[in-house]
Amino acid sequence: MRIESGRMLNDYIQPNKKQYCIPVFQRDYAWTSEQCEKLFEDIVLAFKKDREHFCGSFVYAPLPTRKQIDRYIIIDGQQRFTTLYILIKALADSATDESDKAELEKYLYNEDKFNRYGLDDKSKLKLKPVKTDNDQLQLLMAGKLDKMNKGKDGIIYHNYMLFRELIATFLAEDHDDSIMMIRDGMDSLICADIRLD
């Protein structure tokens, strides 16, 4: 076991050729709108005050893999990780500048430009939740919002739409380059990095 300090965005989500899997024994994605709003406020505050914000622990372990990407199982921190992933998708979809959009999408997908790694569409995503959530996440990433669960169990859809609203409100405050300001605030999120080998 190794314990260090890690940055949620740059150490886990950004690197290419990594995929984080949420095991079946973990509960389905369940973050409430209040938790999402609090996380968004913390991210904005971290950017404005230019300081790090501790957001808990991230416990993970390597998985055997047949493809040339490193795969990990998330043992603790899956709710926060999934929420950040949804927020990045909302940021990318809110970006009006194509270079900002492309940069944000690098956080969502493993690049395989020349099909060297043999990644299928599901392996290209850097997050693989439990089956029920995975189906909804696949629809979100494909931009098929009309096919997503919008009922009370449609938490991924509802939190994505909430983040779109929060981002729109933030943009309306006339911030220059504000999409990337939110990304920079996300980079200030640190956690206790606990890797089990």
Segments from the language model and where they lie:
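Glycine- and hydrophobic-rich flexible loops that cap the catalytic core of alpha/beta enzyme folds
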Residues: 1-197
